[in-house]
From Swiss-Prot:
Keywords: Ribonucleoprotein, Ribosomal protein, RNA-binding, rRNA-binding. Part of the 30S ribosomal subunit. CDD domains: Ribosomal_uS17. PROSITE patterns: RIBOSOMAL_S17. GO terms for cellular component: cytosolic small ribosomal subunit. One of the primary rRNA binding proteins, it binds specifically to the 5'-end of 16S ribosomal RNA. InterPro entries: NA-bd_OB-fold (IPR012340), Ribosomal_uS17 (IPR000266), Ribosomal_uS17_bact/chlr (IPR019984), Ribosomal_uS17_CS (IPR019979). Belongs to the universal ribosomal protein uS17 family. One of its GO terms (biological process) is translation. This is Small ribosomal subunit protein uS17. It comes from Corynebacterium aurimucosum (strain ATCC 700975 / DSM 44827 / CIP 107346 / CN-1). It comes from the Bacteria. GO terms for molecular function: rRNA binding; structural constituent of ribosome.
């Protein structure tokens, strides 16, 4: 083994951040965020929207229904929770 291989640190990849709308806040310290993804159809060129709901950890329970939030990928916190709340971008009116 060479010295260079022994002393190098394994770097972590960048964590994914997504913006979405809170659709439920009824669980303790958990919010459900709907993420929208837009893709162009390969052949016809039409913009197609797909929605996905993910659970995110909200430690202080500050987010409410209708808020636009920024969530970041994290280690698995439970069976379904793999995101955490970073900030509330816009409060619901």
């Amino acid at each position: 083994m060479s010295e260079a291989n022994v002393n190098t640190k394994k770097e972590k990849g960048a964590r994914k951040t997504r913006t979405g709308i809170v659709v439920s806040d009824k669980m303790n310290k958990t919010i459900v965020v709907e993420l929208e993804d837009r893709k162009q159809h390969a052949l016809y060129g039409k913009i197609m929207r797909t929605n996905k709901k993910v659970k995110a950890h909200d430690e202080n329970e500050t987010a409410g229904i209708g808020d636009r939030v920024l969530i970041a990928e994290t280690r698995p916190l439970s069976k379904d929770k793999h995101f955490r709340l970073v900030e509330i971008v816009e409060k619901a009116k």
